[in-house]
Amino acid sequence: MSISSDEAKEKQLVEKAELRLAIADSPQKFETNLQTFLPPLLLKLASPHASVRTAVFSALKNLISRINTLPQVQLPVRALIVQAKEPNLAAQQDSTNVRLYSLLLASKGIDRLSLQDRQQLLPLVVSNISCLTGTVAARMFHILLKLILEWVAPQESSHEQEEFVQFLQLDNDGFSFLMRQFTRFFLLVPSKQVQVSQQPLSRGYTCPGLSLTDVAFFTYDAGVTFNKEQLNKFKKAIFQFVCRGMAATQTIEQSPRMIELMEFLCVVSTDSTNLSDDAAQFMKRFPMPYENEEFITFLQTLYIGNTANGRPPVKAILQEKILSILNRSHFATTKAECISLICSIGLHSSEYKLRSLTLSFIRHVAKLNYKNLNPASSSPSSTDFSTCIVSLIRNNLHAEGWPKLQLGPQTPAFNTAILQRQLQYETLGDILKRDFELVSDLSYIEFLFESLKNDLPQFRSSIQESLLSLVGHLSILPQQSKLKLKNLLRKNLSIDEQQREDNNDAVNSIMALKFVSIKFTNAAFPFHDPEARLFNIWGTVRTNRFDIIEESFKGLQPFWFRVNNASINTSATVKTSDLLGSHLSETEFPPFREFLQVLIDQLDSEAASITRKSLNNAVRFSKQCLISNAIYGKKTMVIQDEDWSVRIDKALELDDTVVSRVNEMVQGMNDDIFIRYLTLLSNEFTATNSKGEQIAIFPYQDPIFGSVLLTLLNFVSNNVLRRLEILVPDLYHLVIMKFQSLSDNDLAVCATIIGIISTAIADSTHVKRITKIAQSQTMAETYVASYVVPRLYLKDQTNHIESDSILNLLNILTTHLSHPGTNKDMILKLVCQVTKFGLLLQVSAQERKDFLKKVMDTIQDKLINDVTAIQTWSYLSLYSTDLENSSLFQEKLLETNVSKQNDFLFSVGESLSVVAGKWSSKYLIKQIDIPNFNVEIMQQKFPATNVTTILDEIFSGCDSTKPSLRKASCIWLLSYIQYLGHLPEVSSKCNDIHLRFMRFLADRDEFIQDSAARGLSLVYEIGGSDLKESMVKGLLKSFTESTAGSASTSATGISGSVSEETELFEPGVLNTGDGSISTYKDILNLASEVGDPALVYKFMSLAKSSALWSSRKGIAFGLGAIMSKSSLEELLLKDQQTAKKLIPKLYRYRFDPFQAVSRSMTDIWNTLIPESSLTISLYFNDILDELLCGMANKEWRVREASTSALLQLIQSQPQEKFSEKMLKIWTMAFRTMDDIKDSVREVGTKFTTVLAKILARSIDVEKGVNPTKSKEILDNILPFLWGPHGLNSDAEEVRNFALTTLIDLVKHSPGAIKPFTPKLIYDFITLFSSIEPQVINYLALNAANYNIDANVIDTQRKNGVTNSPLFQTIEKLINNSDDCMMEEIINVVIKASRKSVGLPSKVASSLVIIILVKRYSIEMKPYSGKLLKVCLTMFEDRNESVNIAFAISMGYLFKVSALDKCIKYSEKLITKYFEPTSTENNKKVVGTAIDSILNYAKSEFDNVASVFMPLIFIACNDEDKDLETLYNKIWTEASSSGAGTVKLYLPEILNVLCVNIKSNDFSIRKTCAKSVIQLCGGINDSIPYPQIVKLFDISREALSGRSWDGKEHIVAALVSLTEKFSQTVADNNDLQESINHVMYTEVSRKSMKYVKKILPLYARYINVNPQEETITFLIEKAKEMIRLLGSESDDSEGSIKQTSDESTIKRIKPNTEITQKSSKENIENEEYVINLLKVSVDICNNSKSRYPMNLLEFIIDEIAYLFHNDRIIHTWRTQLAASEIGISIVGRFSTISSADFIQNVGRLWDQTFPINCNKETIENVKLQMIKFGGLIIQKIPSLQNNIEENLRLLNSIDSTSRIELELKNIGL
């Protein structure tokens, strides 16, 4: 077959390329050829001709073999990658092979590249990587992995990191592609198949989270496989590359890149390597995007997997991570399909944690988006999903063991299992709570009840909570379910826990079951359901837990039942009034008959035990049902509020409506159930029958049975009573057999019941037996007879009673009464029974009279304190017509007023009503307990006779001044009107009664007030319309008019006139120590004795307050009672004047500090004013005026109430209403803050706080307030706040509050306050000193007295200013101000700094200057001069802290000052330092100022450095150590190089020295001299000659004149100069002569003290240039000085001795040689001489011409003098110095020949050795002497023998190892 020309051509090209590559004979050539030919060769793989492609493949095979053998050869990697991305081919050519082989060889080449080269390839590889497809993309991605494998991450948050991100140039598509693949790579797991090298790669395996295609991308398509180690290496590299490279700079929340990064980190955070921790930490840097759709969808997809592309769900650990995120996402609850799959996967998982998280997720969805758990909203494929979930959870619970958890091998750890099961129960509850359909068939409720009963205790609370969450559904259950629920609850509540007492857990489970059951009962069934109420009654069994009992009683109390049910109503919005129960409505009770039927049926059933145990509460509830049924829909006192229980208990005693309604109802009852019920009550009451058999079924005693039975018998028909005859034997048997053991109450109840039944069966044998009374019968029989016979008489049934039986009964009673051993109280009660029903009318008048007398005689003395005796006495009075002295009855009763017991007095009141009204008294009428009795019969027999008489007596008691009688009379009057008010004799006197009660309202005794108030309401009820009107008006008048009227007897007169004898206080109320104040006269006397007539008014005010106004409860009670029933609204509408007076006062009284008063007033307000807010709005101005007026009242209670009321008022009304009176309000507010009374001040503070907030709101321009209006308000208020009522007030509290208010205004309303900035800054600065506590000021002034450093206190005071909120406020003001205010602000700051007195204000001024400089640096320039001047002026302040503060401010000011100003004030600072009057403080301040300038204005400092640096240099040598430290610090910071800086500023330094070294201030001279010395150390010969001469001139001139303390420093300076510039001095004869002359002059001075100091300096000077005459002069002066040294001390010692002789007062220690030797003075003299001699030795050693032998002799003579004189006693110092001087003298020469010199040295040895060779001499001295001897032996042989002999002698005297060693060293 012929070959086409194209094919041949191409083939030829391939062969040529192959040949070129093959003939390359070195690796370098091979590499070069590869760079050229390899990419084009690979392009030929796209040839359409198979032969060409085959040739290329063949060539490649050879090439690759050769490349493999040459590892150093580099491949053209970049060209290959470019070619792989965009091969240079024709459009129709297939580029696949070209790309793949290019990448294959590129991948090989990468391994050979350096790290740097690899990094350079990264941008190329990642660019457009997202556009590549299939295998090419896979291989390119693998190349990227290889490139980043050894990539070195840049430093975190560094510039390099940012540069790297820029370098990558990654677009959004590329970023997304890489992040997607990197994330998937972390899901990759190694293949389990072992890969053999020859075997082709496997393509078919999946990983959790990755499909076949995904896995193939990383392995098959890329042509690689990974083992675990390689995989981990790549993962690590990827993580580094992503987090510290590619995505390092992602900071924008919710951006796509950030979301992709978070997806990546989520996956990595569960990786099996330690990268998971790093990823978790890295994630914390960013907020989790819980609500980002893309992010959440990605996680859901990972969790669920994808069936469409075959991607399985991820591993469980990652699923757990995903769920923990979904559990916090709202968006995750919005996709129903995803939710169903997530829950299904999680609940079917074998992983415990995943199951738990799934349960949490279900709860999360149920809470936020329940409908998505609901099948209706799910897709058709997941129908019934919600049901499916709960079924799944229930199945799981069954699988784990149900109803009790079973632990088996499959169960996780115990704690884990417990937690998960708890979560399952809670999740079940969450779902059921939201899905009524699941609850309606009760199957889950049954399931949970069973679990609660039987599962482990650990789950109890979870199950209970789940059950209780369902109560909202129960009321809407279908009827069938409700019946089922009722059976379930009946079963739960009737469980007898006592059978399982041994198992505590079981008992607790039953209790939990019962608690939930009671909750269900209350929620599911209406209140009128008798069975449900019976369940509640079962819950009250006393063996139940307290919470069950409490919940059960709530189900039996209609108020709490309503409140409870309102709170569990989940379906509708519930009113707050219903939740609080404040809106009262009437709840219907179960019908009485139905309830009885249910109760009796239960008692007859098999499970009767629970009913029996709760029978007492069943009976109690049955009584409540009866009453409630009877009065349903009627107005009575039984209101269903929280006190309903008390109301219903007392209703039959107090409310006639209730009695009549119940009577009607009970009269119609005659059925068997009712009789059965009454029999049951009787059986429970008697407990045993007449045969002694037990008939009670309730296990305990309870008086309720007897009490209810008696109550019912009061109303039943005669027919019923006759049917109850069978009860009489048992009841009679109870009294007879248990007479001694029964309580009085039970006896009375039992006898009364027998008495009532007897009236219907008078002819029965039982009654006949009881009424047949014999003298000999027992007390028990008498007891019953006493109850039965009088009732039979009432019913006119006595014809069956034998005539003597009644007489026998009376005789028995009188006999027992007179017998000492009997129970008198019981007998008297029987006498009451016999007498009150008129039985005595059955016997003859004489017999009656005898009986009455006997009883009266017995009880007459007991009346004062015995209630029974009092009652008996009143009943005896019924027969008073039979006695001569009938008035005795009332007299005896009236005498009981002395009693202090209120209850007793009420009993007397009841008795008085009987004495006065007989059977007309309501009290007596209520005693009738026989059904349907006509009381008029008795009223005819016992007509009322002396009603008026006794009423007049009571009036008289009311008007009495005797307190006890008044109190008793008040109570009696109340009883009188209560029980006899219906009689015309009483109602005709209503005016008088009303007046008495009005007066009692003013009584101090709260009980009397309450009684009087109640009395007023009763009077009001019985009065006519005219009376009612006048009463209301009178009360209002008394309430609104404060003036005390004259005495009045009309209905309106409350207060009487006060005369001298009017008793305002009970004795002892105002005890002063001298007796008590009882009358007006006493008050006058006391006031005049104190000398303050004004006290009279104070006491009068107190009296008024005590009587009426301070105890308004009385009037409030009265008002409340009257007003609740009167049409006061009409009255107020008609009478505007009254309304205007009453409403403001009443408003104020609502806030009275006394709770009782405020409570009563609030009641009145609520009663009187239906529309409170409307009324307040209408009468706002009147109320405001009343309150402002009240705030200034002299009575503290009025002030406090007014303030509290105003506080409430201004908070509830718009500001516009009171804006005009704002100043007045503020004034009064501040006045209350300074009140004398604590409580008023407290309320005042609250009030002003609220005012401040209102003010802040009203001026807040930022919140939209009109700026003009805001300014107008502030124009009014601010002058007030900073005026005499505010900041300048005398009261500290007011000042502080005004300040706080201003600070708050600045803080919260900066815009509004801006125009007032300058004034406020001035006020605030000056205020600093005022608000500083006085104690600190005192302490600062008296610091020395307390040993405290005043500077320390001042520092604290300064810190206090800086940290003060006030200063921060100033700062805020400045920050908010404008440039245009600058001049004004600066002027006020200058003014404040000048006018301020205290330290804090001055310091504040300086700090404000600093703030101004910082904030307005440019604007400040024109004012810098003024401010610098202020600073300089403030340097003169007496307080150092103030000086320092302004010095620091000066530093800041330099920053904004012009150069001329800087120079001017720099020079002023220099002048200030060198002033002759300058103190250390001044110098310190100057130093601080310079330091501040250096720190805060560096460039300005540099401009004036030539002014400052000389001063700093000189001041570094100040005598004061602190100053020296300060200036040294400044010098160090200011000078770039020490010596260089000195040279730089030397001319200026010399100028300053020249001017100041002759200063009048010697300390400055001294400082200058020290500076010269320091200069010598800092300069050298290179400085100009004129400057050297100038230095000498300065020093010489300074020495002219007399000697002064410190002049020696100038001498030292001159000597230092001479030493430094010795050559200059030697070359200049004139200079040398002049210095010689000056030195000679100074040494020749007469002041020996001065000469002593400069003599060593003179010796140093001679040492520079020794001359014979100067040496001779030195010897002369030195000798003279040494001889003088001891003489001073001799003189002083002489004087001491003399004193000692003259006086024996103080003993002086004897001045022995030892004490003198160690004295300071001796040591100083000795050291001085030694120093002088050593300097002299230096002169000898430095002599350049002839050796000064005379000086040597002088030295040796003086050493001898030191050893042997008695003025300076030598010590070891001289001994040591002698040897050292010897060593120095001998050691200078190598050989010594001078005989004089040798002689002198010998003399020195001879002087030294004898002194030093003692045993006592210290070792160091001896060692030094041995060295000296060794030198002599070495240099002067002629003295050798003598020396050696001496040294051997020394060794023999005191031989030590060190001495022996030293001797050995010198050859001995």
From Swiss-Prot:
UniProt subcellular location: Cytoplasm; Nucleus
GO biological-process terms attached to the record: ERAD pathway; proteasome assembly
Primary location recorded for the protein, binned into one broad class: cytoplasm
GO MF: ATPase inhibitor activity; molecular adaptor activity
Alphabetical list of Pfam families matching this protein: ECM29_N, HEAT_ECM29
One GO cellular component term: nucleus
Keyword set includes Nucleus: yes
N-acetylserine, modified sites: S2
InterPro entries: ARM-like, ARM-type_fold, Ecm29_N, HEAT_ECM29
PTM-bearing positions, type Phosphoserine: S1692
Keywords of this entry: Acetylation, Cytoplasm, Nucleus, Phosphoprotein, Proteasome, Repeat
HEAT repeats: 32-69, 116-153, 256-292, 313-351, 384-422, 439-476, 590-627, 707-745, 748-780, 781-818, 846-885, 945-982, 988-1025, 1030-1067, 1137-1174, 1178-1215, 1272-1311, 1361-1398, 1422-1459, 1503-1540, 1544-1581, 1649-1687, 1746-1785, 1830-1867
Subunit and partners: Component of the proteasome. ECM29 binds to both proteasome 19S and 20S particles.
Misc remark: Present with 2950 molecules/cell in log phase SD medium.
Family the entry assigns: Belongs to the ECM29 family.
Primary role: Stabilizes the proteasome holoenzyme, probably by tethering the 20S proteolytic core particle and the 19S regulatory particle. The proteasome is a multicatalytic proteinase complex which is characterized by its ability to cleave peptides with Arg, Phe, Tyr, Leu, and Glu adjacent to the leaving group at neutral or slightly basic pH. The proteasome has an ATP-dependent proteolytic activity.
Full protein name: Proteasome component ECM29
Species assigned in the record: Saccharomyces cerevisiae (strain ATCC 204508 / S288c)
Organism placement in taxonomy: Eukaryota, Fungi, Dikarya, Ascomycota, Saccharomycotina
